[in-house]
Amino acid sequence: MNVILLDKIANLGSLGDQVSVKAGYARNFLLPFGKAVVANAANVEVFEARRAELEAKLAAELATATARAEKLAALEAVVIASKAGDEGKLFGSIGNRDIADAVTAAGVELAKSEVRLPLGALRTTGNFEVEVQVHTEVKAVVKVTVVAEA
C-alpha cells in the first residue's frame, strides 16, 4: 500500500515521502494515528497544498523538543531513594516510571515512554546516565543517582 507520510517515522521516511508499506501497518498504525494518508491523486493535491503548514508544525514541535532537552540536560542529578541491601543491591528496581516521576518532580515534564533504558531497569545504587528521547530527532541525557533509603 502506498502512503504519503505526514510526520517523520523512524526507519521509514520523513514528511512528504511516498513510501510503500504493508497494508496492516498502514491500516493499524499509520492511518489511525494521522501519521500518513493513502497516496491517491486527491490526497497528493491536498498534501501539496498543506505542505508548508505541516512543515511549520514539525519545526515548532522540534523547537519545543529541543528546549525540553536543554532543560533536561541542565538538571542536576536526580536523586531516587530505594530500599537496598548492604552491598548496594536494590530490593526491586528503578524503572522508566520511577525515573520519569522523579524528573517531573524536579521540575521538567517527562513521560515514562520517553525514558530509554537499553540495559533494563536500574538494580544497584550509584550514579547513572539515562538517555531520554523527547523527539525522534532529539535526545538528552539525565543524570540519576540511586541511593539507599535510611
Swiss-Prot record:
Matching InterPro entries: Ribosomal_bL9, Ribosomal_bL9/RNase_H1_N, Ribosomal_bL9_bac/chp, Ribosomal_bL9_C, Ribosomal_bL9_C_sf, Ribosomal_bL9_N, Ribosomal_bL9_N_sf
PANTHER family, per database record: 50S RIBOSOMAL PROTEIN L9
Designated name of the protein: Large ribosomal subunit protein bL9
HAMAP family (alphabetical): Ribosomal_bL9
Record keywords: Ribonucleoprotein, Ribosomal protein, RNA-binding, rRNA-binding
Domain of life: Bacteria
Keyword Glycoprotein listed: no
Molecular function in Gene Ontology: rRNA binding; structural constituent of ribosome
Entry GO terms, CC: ribonucleoprotein complex; ribosome
Job description of the protein: Binds to the 23S rRNA.
Pfam family, one: Ribosomal_L9_N
GO BP, one annotated term: translation
Gene name of the encoded protein: rplI
Coiled-coil regions, chain positions: none
Annotated organism of origin: Shewanella denitrificans (strain OS217 / ATCC BAA-1090 / DSM 15013)
Family, similarity comment: Belongs to the bacterial ribosomal protein bL9 family.
Span of the signal peptide: none
